């Protein structure tokens, strides 16, 4: 286990010599028509596709072709800021200076700053320079519509598949419309 952990850390830091990694996007449907986008970073495309396909199959889903679910999501930068850290007017002024696209204020505890993926690093760096504490900052696949699953057993099936995919060392992130 120690070797696996060290290898995973080196892989994440890009410190493994002579190994080239590629980013790949897999798409498919989970149980109950939940759309999934799986982002991977791998040094072995064949191993990873087999692992992802196995997880989809075992989890009651189907691995789809390229662009089979991507059209249901918007790619965007998302930065989360605690409301207690700054007032809305101050944050709005900062994000306009930084070049962000929008701010969502519906959550009672957090603001969500939205950027284009191309401008994400600039906005994040600008907010860091202004010493604004960010709880999260990442480029995400945001679903245009969410699938509501009322039945807890059905929801558990979806969560189980997402967890199986997430447990794969090559998987960077899993996005769903659930």
Q: Positions of the model-derived regions?
A:
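Long, contiguous binding/interaction regions
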Residues: 1-31, 41-76, 80-149, 153-178
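Active-site-flanking beta-strand signature of metal-NTP-handling nucleotidyl enzymes
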Residues: 35-38
């Amino acid at each position: 286990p120690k070797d696996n952990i060290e290898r995973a850390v080196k892989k994440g830091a890009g410190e493994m010599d002579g190994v080239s990694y590629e980013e790949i996007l897999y798409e498919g449907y989970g149980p109950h028509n939940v759309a999934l986008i799986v982002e991977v970073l791998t040094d072995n495309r064949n191993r990873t596709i087999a692992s992802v396909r196995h997880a989809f199959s075992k989890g009651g889903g189907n691995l789809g072709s390229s662009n089979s679910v991507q059209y249901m999501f918007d790619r965007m930068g998302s930065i989360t800021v605690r409301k207690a850290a700054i007032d809305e007017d101050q944050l709005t002024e900062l994000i306009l200076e930084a070049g962000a696209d929008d701010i969502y204020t519906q959550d009672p505890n957090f603001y969500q700053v939205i950027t284009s993926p191309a401008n994400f690093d600039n906005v994040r760096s600008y907010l860091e320079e202004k010493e604004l504490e960010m709880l999260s900052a990442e480029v995400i696949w945001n679903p245009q519509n969410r699938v509501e699953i009322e039945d807890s057993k059905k929801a558990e099936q979806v969560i189980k598949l997402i967890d199986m995919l997430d447990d794969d060392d090559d998987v960077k992130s899993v996005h769903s419309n659930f």
